[in-house]
């Protein structure tokens, strides 16, 4: 018989930098998960993506064991990296802070594809373009 899931915890953690301090410790501790075991596993799986924020979805079972699924980095993080800016615009409709090319947009959409609710790459590109627009980043041809 399958184990019963008692909680699903969603966290956004910098790759390779999971440690038992807040916010990770308290989020896992209240469900009785072995925090160090999670941190070691997460850091091992994300070692190749160092410096990027990698969201994770942790399923905690009734016997306090856990499994986790790594998601793709947030579109905003990928867009900021591609545009070479620190943060998005505070007034995206008035002031633009940077721009990305159509090729960069397609690359980001390709990366995000598994986590997006899109059937093809064009739809994924539109979703990512909308995120970029809301950050004050223009898309050039």
Curated annotation (Swiss-Prot):
Question: Does the record bear rRNA-binding in its keywords?
Answer: yes
Full protein name: Large ribosomal subunit protein uL11
Q: Which organism is it from?
A: Trichodesmium erythraeum (strain IMS101)
Q: Which GO terms describe its cellular component?
A: cytosolic large ribosomal subunit
Could you state what the record's PTM comment says about this protein?
One or more lysine residues are methylated.
What does the sequence similarity comment in the record state about its family?
Belongs to the universal ribosomal protein uL11 family.
SMART domains xref list: RL11
What Gene Ontology molecular function terms does this protein carry? large ribosomal subunit rRNA binding; structural constituent of ribosome
Q: What PROSITE patterns does this protein map onto?
A: RIBOSOMAL_L11
